[in-house]
Amino acid sequence: GMKTSEAKRLEFRRNLETGTFMIAPGIYDALSAKIAEVSGLNCLAMGGYAISATRLGQPDVGLLSLTEMRESLKQICEATDIPVIGDGDTGYGNALNVIRTENEYERAGGSCIFFEDQKWPKRCGHMEGKQVIPAEIHVQKIRAACDARIDKNTVIMARTDTRAINGVDDAIRRGHLYADAGAEILFIEALRDREEVERLAREFEGTGTYLFANMIEGGKTPIIPASELKEMGYAGVFWSCASLYLVAKTLKDAFTELARDGTSDAFLSRMIDFSEFNHFIGLDRYRELEKRYAADDKSQP
């Protein structure tokens, strides 16, 4: 990307303030980020679930370290001019760890960073067996994250996973507490039905706090299109696993055919070709740079 981190943060804020609804797919590397950008999406989410799957080949159960996550975030941010939301998990420890995580993610180029109130080791928000920390402890983590910002335009988002454990009322209670602590966006994970998704929007209407929803195919929450979420009052939506599930099926189907046929003929029509990919990935620019910086090689060593 050519835009500075500061410019991307301002763009993210402008989207919030102007009611420009953000559709943020879960991105896990530089390539998926570039593809999202040329597809006309206006926001990206670094997905811990997808990064655990692609980097480790393991489930989203808290196996990745801050360093690995920061490295992935940096690769994503550098590849695109679109604002990126960083998945800060639990902050990888207490409020002091949250401070370090916030700073690392901000330096990596994140426009917004969210921190969740799960007990570590965390797990995907739609899996069974989650546990949450007391709201008071997470309030201090959110305060720490907000205070730690180097660029005050970085947006801190608070995520709560309490719905599955203590119900919707507790999710709303925690949402208000986290907003009071400085979180500008709330992300209430794994709501069960459309009514809960609507109720949440009503609860925070006129409070000045923005809301993000999360859509995971086959997860706990029903799939609701962006237009309807926007109408309810949401500021944006994560499609956390769509890219991962799509890539996994595409490759599995194609590799099965390759193993069977010994050739790519069966899936050739589903592929981008050599020249199209080289154009997309930016080879033309590098050809120009080669010309510009080519040395006259006639001189003797």
Each language-model region and where it sits:
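Alpha/beta enzyme core
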Residues: K3-A235, W239, L246-T256, Y293-D296
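Extended, intrinsically disordered, low-complexity segments
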Residues: K3-S5, F12, L244-P301
